[in-house]
Regions:
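Beta-strand-rich recognition/accessory modules
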Residues: 7, 102-113, 140-224, 500-505
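Aromatic- and acidic-residue-enriched segments that line the glycan-binding/catalytic groove
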Residues: 242-244, 276-285, 311-332, 378-383, ...
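Active-site-proximal substrate-binding groove within the catalytic cores of carbohydrate-active enzymes
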Residues: 26, 184-191, 396-616
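Active-site-adjacent "subsite" loops/lids of carbohydrate-active enzymes
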Residues: 223-224, 231-240, 302-360
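Glycine-rich, aromatic-flanked loop segments that form ligand/cofactor-binding clefts
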Residues: 206, 210, 260-266, 287-334, ...
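An acidic-aromatic substrate-binding cleft motif
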Residues: 203-263, 267-272
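Polysaccharide-binding surfaces and accessory modules of carbohydrate-active proteins
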Residues: 4-6, 11, 25-168, 604-615
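The substrate-binding groove and active-site-proximal loops of carbohydrate-active enzymes
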Residues: 226-243, 271-287, 331-350, 383-397, ...
């Protein structure tokens, strides 16, 4: 039999082929451990042989092989698969497939990997949780799989990476004819397959290796500070109110000694929802965003805009979807909103966003609201969810990723924040900068204590659910969490449904530090300037300066401990590449907490916390200091 190998810095793939056989294995070059693979497959349909036929790569003939890859061929069904190997980020091995077909067969799916797990004492795949904003199976899309001391997955947020019948593989649910998949008419290239390596086996070691791969792969590793209009006035905005709030925030932060904000964002409230017009300005913004763009430039920042693909979140949403049907777009009859998988709609909307970059100095989009549920219709240009729900979501996100690429061609430095009804796949970060946590409300209050305590309980409880219960593998630095929020439209329903939550200066300082401990690189300020005083502006500036200077540490922040919604001690630990660390410990109950907790790095911490007490400490450059100790 013939042998040929392809290697990256950390992984080597070896093929043995001949006499009608193909054997594949992967080797972790850091440890020398090897993993046998049964290979991938293509599942096709044709009138010749019925509805479905699996074509395993291991049954195909190795037609040719060279230093960059190899070609497989199945003469019986006219399918050829070219596999090219190169090095991905962080020394991982990347396999790129190119598929050709002699007939216009229906391609149900493409499966990559097929790593046999029998010889591994450790395996992990993301658990299936309850539906929150997307179906649980879809929420698990785009998560990696860990086997022994390697990780696998496809370079897309919508591959179904998992373990089935003793093999770890990545399935891409194409659910279309070959002619629909092959953009150039001749060949189809599904997302590439990734195999990466860790220094040892086990969840912590492989997760750390995977997230370091993600940090190299991701577009953004920056710390942004920007203002968003939503919680100040919500839909009730006009140019005068925007000018007033933008100016007040810019002046307040400047007076406090903070650098110019990166961006000022107009949220929902500018769109004409009452007429059959495609994302046009309403009468309040007759001149578009010319004035706002000039103002943000004067303030030293860029301009940001909210777009809600599904048509917003009001009673007018189904009405607007119906109005757009009159001009050639489609609506989702299940969710009674715009069909966000309609390829014409996605193309035109991302064209509109690219136009905003050119006309209004936009460098940030909050893209808010995709598919609440799948669309069953067959005439919208996407696979019908009645036939293939997974294929629907694959197609939807293919269209949006193409749209994101188009926007970046116009504005390479644009920041894309992908929010509601997306899912927390780290592979989104090849196209977007931030992803909404998608298991929480914009703001929430739960558990014991005053409004500050209940606010911290809510968000931190959702972090625990995301990272400990659902075990999502996603970098904290790229997670959008809708805070800090200190604004007149923010209410704690336990105490008042009409009066905003108000903090003392001391409470505000604690709140800001706790927000920063979560590690997000997007500090989008939902402030109402009239609720701020000089002390609060100074606090905001000081805490944001600290967070920006510590972003290289805080972006690795990880939750540990009890569920804050139920009371008890918990915290966050962030450890930078050089060992610098920041730790937060908090008691979310009204009783003294004698705690003993295991932190994410395996170290134990114990002590006593007073009711609702929070302590944040840092060790940087060998010096340890207490940042804040306070009670909420």
């Amino acid at each position: 039999m013939k042998r040929i190998s392809y290697a990256s810095a950390k992984v080597r793939k070896t093929l043995l082929f001949g006499e009608g056989k193909l054997i594949e294995d992967y080797e972790n070059l850091l440890t020398g451990r090897r993993y046998t693979s049964c290979g991938g497959n293509v599942v096709i349909g044709s009138t010749k042989f019925g509805s479905r036929k699996k074509l395993p790569f291991s049954d195909m003939e190795v037609f040719s092989a060279d230093e960059s890859g190899y070609t497989l061929r199945d003469d019986g069904f006219g399918i050829t698969v070219r596999v090219d190997c190169d090095e991905a980020e962080c020394g991982a091995l990347r396999e790129k497939l190119t598929v050709t077909a002699e007939e216009d067969v229906f391609v149900h799916s493409v499966c990559l990997g097929g790593m046999i797990i029998a010889d591994s004492s450790f395996t992990w795949q993301a658990p299936l949780g309850k539906r929150v904003f997307v179906p649980s199976k879809i929420a698990r899309f785009g998560q990696p799989v860990y086997v022994g001391d390697v990780f696998i997955g496809a370079e897309t947020p919508v591959a179904e990476n998992g373990i089935v019948k003793g093999t770890a593989r990545s399935v891409y649910h194409t659910a279309r004819k070959f002619s629909e998949l092959a953009e150039d008419g001749d060949a189809y290239s599904p997302p590439a397959f990734i195999v990466g390596a860790a220094k040892e086996s086990g969840f912590d070691a492989v997760s750390d290796a995977f997230l370091r791969y993600v940090s190299e792969m991701a577009l953004s590793d920056s710390f942004r500070v920007q203002f968003n209009s939503w919680y100040d006035n919500m839909l009730d905005i006009d140019p005068e109110k925007i000018e007033k709030s933008f100016t007040a925030v810019g002046d307040g932060m400047k007076k406090a000694g903070f650098r110019p904000l990166d961006c000022y964002v107009v949220d929902d409230g500018w769109t004409e929802y009452d007429k059959p017009l495609f994302w046009e300005f309403n009468s309040k913004f007759a001149d578009g965003f010319v004035k706002e763009s000039r103002l943000t430039e004067k303030l030293g920042g860029k301009f940001g805009v909210w777009f809600g693909p599904r048509g917003g979140y009001t009673s007018q949403t189904p009405v607007y979807a119906g109005l757009l049907e009159k001009i050639g777009y489609h609506s989702n009859r299940y969710s009674r909103d715009i069909c966000t998988a309609d390829p014409k709609y996605v193309s035109d909307l991302t064209d509109r966003m690219a136009e905003f970059c050119e006309k209004f100095n936009v460098d940030y989009f909050k893209i808010d609201g995709f598919a609440i549920c799948s669309c069953p219709s067959a005439g919208h240009g996407h696979p019908s969810a009645l036939c293939n729900v997974k294929g629907f979501y694959v197609y939807l996100w293919e269209q949006w990723l193409k749209g994101f690429e188009k926007i970046r061609r116009v504005c390479p430095g644009v920041c894309l924040n992908v929010t509601s009804y997306a899912h927390c796949s780290p592979w989104f970060l090849k196209w977007a900068d931030f992803i909404w946590m998608n298991n929480a409300s914009d703001m929430g209050y739960v558990g014991e204590g005053d409004s500050l305590s209940r606010c911290l309980n809510y968000r931190d409880s959702r972090y625990r659910a995301l990272f400990l219960d659902d075990e999502r593998q996603f970098p904290a630095g790229n997670l959008y969490n809708h805070e800090p929020c200190y604004a007149k439209r923010n209410f704690d329903p336990k105490f008042s449904k009409s009066s905003p939550v108000v903090y003392t200066d001391g409470q505000f300082e604690l709140y800001m530090y706790c927000c920063m401990m979560r590690g997000s690189g997007l500090a989008e300020l939902y402030f109402s300037p009239e609720m701020m005083n000089d002390a609060k502006w100074n606090i905001a500036a000081r805490v944001l300066e600290w967070a920006e200077s510590r972003h290289g540490i805080l972006k690795y922040s990880r939750f540990f401990g009890s569920d804050p919604a139920k009371g008890g001690a918990y915290g966050y630990l962030a450890v930078g590449d050089n060992g610098d660390r920041v730790t937060m410990l908090r008691n979310s109950s009204g009783e003294v907490s004698e705690y003993e907790l295991t932190m994410p790095d395996g170290k134990k911490t114990s002590g006593t916390l007073a009711p609702f007490e929070t302590v944040i400490t840092e060790t940087v450059g060998g010096q340890t200091r207490e940042i804040i100790r306070a009670k909420s």
